[in-house]
């Protein structure tokens, strides 16, 4: 009897997909007032019920990303530790958990970011250089015009220094000075660089760890070839901006932890103490360097022919 009743109930269900109705009026009238009008009035889609459990639902079709609603601030922001787990609660990265409470400071990795009312190269003054718990390198608070921002500090950067941010490529190479940001095409060959962009205007993505630096090897046909700290070569456009010098906190790899508890303070959990078989990866091997990584869209051979 129960099986017959369940069969009749399943047959009575309407399995047709939900139909989309016309956009409903604004559900968030306050969204227009946020971020000086950056948020537009979202249009909601009403789904008509097709099952008894789906009575009414409203979905936002054009709701902007949360990053566009976040206003930049130099004030440290509170963080919630994930313990290496994703949104499902499963561990994705082992060895993470616990540790002292940390506050996140928003780092501006796009060095050439002029103010709205100005254009061209501009200077900034270093206010302070301090420790950042969220990264191995030190950070610097710089000010220029009517704003302040955090950037990655270089090796010899101190409070009171003046740094230059430029996007101009001249006929002659500039006199490279530590802490300044220039396009790769404006720097002389052999310059030590850090915080390199992979695409113009995207922000620094390479050589950001403490004590690291790359080398500008050569410039070919509007592109620049640099050597990463791993000895791998990378080809990018010469308009990509890089910072001159070496990243701060050079002695980071020479520190002595001293005890296991200090690693727990840093948020590192212990791994298993069991003996693990060495599967062939252990030991030194002679491996060839990986091929050069290129972010430049070169024309193919078929297109040239």
Curated annotation (Swiss-Prot):
Any one of the GO CC terms: nucleoplasm
Main subcellular location of this protein, as a coarse class: mitochondrion
Chain segments carrying region Disordered: 264-283
Subcellular localization: Mitochondrion
SMART domains xref list: Ribosomal_L2, Ribosomal_L2_C
Bias (Basic residues) ranges: 274-283
Summary of subunit composition and partner proteins: Component of the mitochondrial large ribosomal subunit (mt-LSU). Mature mammalian 55S mitochondrial ribosomes consist of a small (28S) and a large (39S) subunit. The 28S small subunit contains a 12S ribosomal RNA (12S mt-rRNA) and 30 different proteins. The 39S large subunit contains a 16S rRNA (16S mt-rRNA), a copy of mitochondrial valine transfer RNA (mt-tRNA(Val)), which plays an integral structural role, and 52 different proteins.
PANTHER family, per the entry: LARGE RIBOSOMAL SUBUNIT PROTEIN UL2M, RIBOSOMAL PROTEIN L2
Protein name: Large ribosomal subunit protein uL2m
Organism whose genome encodes this protein: Homo sapiens (Human)
């Amino acid at each position: 009897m129960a099986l017959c009743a369940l069969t009749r109930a399943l047959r009575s269900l309407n399995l047709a997909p939900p139909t989309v109705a016309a956009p409903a009026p604004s559900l968030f009238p306050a969204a227009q007032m946020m971020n000086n009008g950056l948020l537009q009035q979202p249009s909601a889609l009403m789904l008509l019920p097709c099952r008894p459990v789906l009575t009414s639902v409203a979905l936002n079709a054009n709701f902007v990303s949360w990053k566009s609603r976040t206003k930049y601030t130099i004030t440290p922001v509170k963080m919630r530790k994930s313990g290496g787990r994703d949104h499902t609660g499963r561990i994705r990265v082992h060895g993470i958990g616990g540790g002292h409470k940390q506050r996140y400071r928003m780092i501006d990795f796009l060095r050439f970011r002029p103010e709205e009312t100005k254009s061209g190269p501009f200077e900034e003054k270093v206010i302070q250089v301090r420790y950042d718990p969220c990264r191995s390198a030190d950070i610097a608070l710089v000010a220029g015009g009517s704003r302040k921002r955090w950037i990655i500090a270089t090796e010899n950067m101190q409070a009171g220094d003046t740094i230059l941010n430029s996007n101009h490529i001249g006929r002659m190479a500039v006199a490279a000075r530590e802490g300044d940001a220039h396009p790769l095409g404006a720097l002389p060959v052999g310059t030590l660089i850090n915080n390199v962009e992979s695409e113009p205007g995207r922000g620094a993505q390479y050589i950001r760890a403490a004590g690291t630096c790359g080398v500008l090897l050569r410039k070919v046909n509007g592109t620049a070839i640099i050597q990463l700290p791993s000895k791998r070569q990378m080809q990018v456009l010469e308009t990509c901006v890089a910072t001159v010098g070496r990243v701060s906190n050079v002695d980071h790899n020479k520190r002595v932890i001293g005890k296991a508890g200090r690693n727990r303070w840093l948020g590192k959990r212990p791994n298993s103490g069991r003996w693990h078989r060495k599967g062939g990866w252990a030991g030194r091997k002679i491996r060839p360097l990986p091929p050069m990584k290129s972010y430049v869209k070169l024309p193919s051979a078929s297109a040239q022919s």
